[in-house]
């Protein structure tokens, strides 16, 4: 499977490592070369400095026709723009944008963009933990995934 990850923060780097370790073709883009310090020395994918919202940069990086495109920067708008470019111009199989503002999820879904909102996931995980009580619960709360996409 070919994956393109825009944003090599903690989430992007962790996913890049995990997918690369499963023998997938992984391309990671970030505007800062320092971000690639989060990747291990054994990282089997490509790390490319560039703007993940720029169609030409994405094409040169080999993103066209990727099976999965993950936009994981800290900016909702940047992630949605990158996912739109990937879907509309690069014919990727699936595109997901990480967002922080849950209010925007519905609007992005109307555009056909799948989103993962860490704000909603964290709130849901805490609510689930509190509603179940703490007896027998693990010290680490596992997130409940929420992916919003147009049906």
Please name every model-derived segment.
Residues 1-151:
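Cytosolic regulatory regions of ion transport systems
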